[in-house]
Each structure stands twice: as structure tokens, then as C-alpha cells.
Amino acid sequence: MTLTAIFRGEHLEPPPWLYARLAQGSLMRLIYRRLLADLAGSLPPGTRVLDVGAGPGYLLSYLARDRPDLSLWGLDLSHDMIRRARPRQRAMAPETAPRWLVADACRLPFPAGIFGRVVASFSFHIWPCPVAGLQELQRVLAPGGRAWVYELRREASLPDLKAFARDLGLPLPFVYLGSQVVRRHHALAASEFTSLIRQAAGARGTLQPAHHIFWRAELQPA
């Protein structure tokens, strides 16, 4: 499958109500816990964090609970997704609750250099502007900041799937069948992801496997 086909795959994404339901499920909660451990353990106190493509907002809600010292911002292009995220904000103390807004990853509504960490989890493959989007993540990074972009690895092997299932305490058949369903249209190959990173960030972007079956791209400030 070509890059053009991948980045025109929005019709393959679940509607917001179904995505929100899936995000509440046990599998996504386990995955969010892994990403949360990556984030929470790496951020200095008071870091300003932006979640791009935040969906219904579970990752930032979990992060707000574990790290109330952080300043959290979440955005999504879907009004419905942000509508679903905001009720969790009302249940938190105002000083710790994430701030939610509807916005486009291709044109982030922030000045340059203000976020210590930017994260995008499993939304990048449907961005219509992959290179410009990565450059926008770089643009808003503060000096010393990092952007992390998580996606599913198309090359994930059976041993990778076994390790992932073992770590999360899930049945291998469940993980295997699920991966086969989503990997064709929702996963990136190393060559594809690396090419986009090089176009956007040059030597200031790297790609490495994460949690057995995912990629994590890391971008430094431009």
C-alpha cells in the first residue's frame, strides 16, 4: 500500500462514538497505561504537555491524575471527540484539568516554542498533512522539548505479538486477530515512517520500536 493510500484512509476510521467506546475498553486502557508510564516518568515538574489528536481524552485524563503538577492541553479535529473529553475535565480540580480545544494538527493554534512535550498516539496515520504536521509538532516544542508520535508497526512479528500479549496479560489469539484487522490500514512500515520523518525533521527525528508492536518517533525542536 502506498503512502497516498494510507493517508487517504480516513473512511476506514471508526466514527467518533465507536472510537470513544473502543478507547474505554480494556485493551486501550492497558495501552494507555504503557504510554502513561513513558510520559509520566520522563517529564520534569510543571512541564507543559500537548496531546495532538487526543480523541475522547483518556490519555491526558490519566496523566492529570498521576501528574497533577503538569500543564495539559489536548486537541482534536473532531468537535464530537472534544465534546466527549470535556466532561472528564469538569470532574477535576481546575488547576489540574486538561484544556481541550478543536484544532487541526496541520496548523496548531499555538506560538512557537511553548511545549516541553508533544504526544500524538495512533492518529498520525490519518493526518492529511503528515510532513507539515510533524513540522508543526517541532515548531511548538520548547528548547530541550521532545515530540513523541506513536503508531502501529506494520512489521511487528509473531514473537513481537507474543511479547505484547504476555506483557499486557492478553490472549495471543485476541492480539493476533486484532493486529491483522488493523495493521493493513492503520499501521506504518519503517520505510514509510522514516521517509516522512526525514522530510520533516532531517537529523532531528528518530524512529524506534516501542512496546513490541508500536513505533515511537521522536522529534527535537527545529
Model-identified regions with their sequence ranges:
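Class I SAM-dependent methyltransferase SAM/SAH-binding core
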Residues: 50, 56-107
